[in-house]
């Protein structure tokens, strides 16, 4: 799957969204989250592909860092007012919604907030119960929310879901024709190429979804269990080998 931060385009102007994409230190967030379990990975470049899948390309912008983020804001007319940037009397201040009581989520969110402060963007952390995620998402009451999605065997379908304006409350209409072209293309490899182009442009031009981590997949099993465990895309419904050879060590 993929863990991400989602920026609400109804509440956060495009230049600020672009600055957040450029300024977030995803590698440090990963380190905070996974260091205790000894997991290391390269920051993901996609919401739709795992790095091991056919067609994967790193779609994340290459010009990143605090200085890049500040320049994006200043080029858009934002000026520092104390610790934070502002424009037309409105401070770059937004609510970062987290869900549940996971300590790692709290720690990484605080780091994210602290890092944005260095850039000049204020993030106020709002914690809600896991049960409120759907309500908050439907009402679009968040500025930024932490979320996560499963990655499927078909990145094309995922790209069509994430990167159409219909799902993003009308934002990114200029890319709808590219999404439609992708779905109308018969050759699957060409579809994958268009999907990566669509994702790259959406990250650069619309800036809503920030892929942060893929993470590990652990399963707890009784000692002695053989031929069973994390299995990526394989499911017993479609692949009998998932369960037919499961058993106990002799």
Label each PLM-derived region with a short phrase.
Residues 2, 89-94, 207-209:
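Active-site lining segments that contact anionic ligands and/or coordinate catalytic metals
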Residues 5, 124, 180-184:
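Short, well-ordered beta-strand elements within core beta-sheets of diverse protein domains
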Residues 79-151, 188:
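Ligand/substrate-recognition segments at binding pockets and active sites
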């Amino acid at each position: 799957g993929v863990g991400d931060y989602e920026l609400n385009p109804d509440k956060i102007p495009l230049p600020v969204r672009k600055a957040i994409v450029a300024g977030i230190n995803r590698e440090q967030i990963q380190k905070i989250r996974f260091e205790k379990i000894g997991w290391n990975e390269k920051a993901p470049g996609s919401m739709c592909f795992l790095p091991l899948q056919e067609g994967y390309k790193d779609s994340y912008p290459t010009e990143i860092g605090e200085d890049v983020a500040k320049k994006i804001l200043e080029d858009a007319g934002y000026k520092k007012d104390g610790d934070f940037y502002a424009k037309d009397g409105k401070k770059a201040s937004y609510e970062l919604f987290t869900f549940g009581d996971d300590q790692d989520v709290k720690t990484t969110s605080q780091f994210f907030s602290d890092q944005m402060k260095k850039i000049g963007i204020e993030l106020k952390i709002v914690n809600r119960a896991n049960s409120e995620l759907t309500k908050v998402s439907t009402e679009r009451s968040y500025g930024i929310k932490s979320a996560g999605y499963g990655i499927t065997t078909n990145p094309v379908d995922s790209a069509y879901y994430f990167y159409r304006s219909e799902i993003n409350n009308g934002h990114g209409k200029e890319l709808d024709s590219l999404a439609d072209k992708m779905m109308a293309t018969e050759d699957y490899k060409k579809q994958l190429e268009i999907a990566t182009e669509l994702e790259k442009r959406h990250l650069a031009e619309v800036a809503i979804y920030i892929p942060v981590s893929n993470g590990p997949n652990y399963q707890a099993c009784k000692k002695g269990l053989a031929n069973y465990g994390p299995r990526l895309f394989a499911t017993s419904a479609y692949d009998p080998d998932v369960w037919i050879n499961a058993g106990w060590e002799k």
